[in-house]
Amino acid sequence: LEDFIFIILIYNNFIKKYIPVLPNNFKPFKSNKQNLIRVGPKRDGGYIIDKRIIKKSKTIITCGLNDDWEFEKNYLQINPECNVIAYDHTVNKKFWKMRFKKDFLALIMLKKLTFNKILDVFKYIDYKFFFKDKNIHFSKKIVQKKNKSHEVSIKEILNKKQNIILKIDIEGDEYKILGAVNNECHKINLLIVEFHNISKNIGKIKKFLSNSKFKIIHLHANNYGGIDKFNNPNVIEVTLINSKKFFVNKKKSTKKYPILGLDYKNLKRREDIRLKFND
């Protein structure tokens, strides 16, 4: 019996040490299994959505683009009537020149040998083909309050818009605009946010959730970010649905995260991050 108790204690210590424990209000609400689908690649850049929003959502607004629009591209294959409006002040001519130079050098030095990596060298061509006609990229910085011509606020972005999918990945600046997002919640069907530096900003996320009509329906730890000294993932990908527009079960999910067959590693060569919640 003593040996058994000792093993249990060792196991519990292992769990506490290696599996991040997030606050209970981060735990997703229960969703019907058939409603959750993955859009985008089975790697970094893919996200989970509720398929109930597809026919009712006509525009994806992407805040933070970098060089990845696979989610948007895949979504348009599912719903061709949708359009994409993206904002990212860092994606400009200088960005593409530096990226092409880096990728081309990697190619001639035989560091890019897979088909997909070779295609990446010509990413700019894909960018020009995708962002034309109904799909637009604005090289503007997303801010809480606009002061300069190259800046844009959430209120301005969502002006005269309805039934939006809003996707935010702006490397830590998301916390500055959460209040504005809540103020415009009646225009948004689905919200996808990458939260960065979780331990530092956990209070801000809790406040946002407590004051919001958006309810978490899915959560995944981005293994690119790893785990911090407080045993929290540094980056989490969160999908929230507007509970004023779509039914949300009041019960919390009992699923284990990541969800097999739905979630995939952002970085393939690194273990995915399992999550627990304070019940």
Q: Model-flagged regions — what are they?
A:
Residues 1-12:
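N-terminal amphipathic/basic-hydrophobic helices that include classical n-h-c signal peptides
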Residues 10-54:
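Class I SAM-dependent methyltransferase Rossmann-like catalytic core
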Residues 30-32, 138, 162-168:
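Acidic/glycine-enriched edge-of-secondary-structure segments
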Residues 39-145:
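SAM cofactor-binding core of SAM-dependent methyltransferases
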Residues 45-47, 69, 151, 175-178:
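Short, well-ordered alpha-helical scaffold segments within catalytic/effector domains
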Residues 59-61, 71-86, 97-98, 155-279:
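Conserved acidic-Pro-Pro-aromatic motif
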Residues 143-149, 223-227:
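A short acidic, often aromatic-flanked loop/helix-cap motif at beta-alpha or helix-coil junctions
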Residues 146-158:
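Core dinuclear metal-dependent hydrolase active-site scaffold
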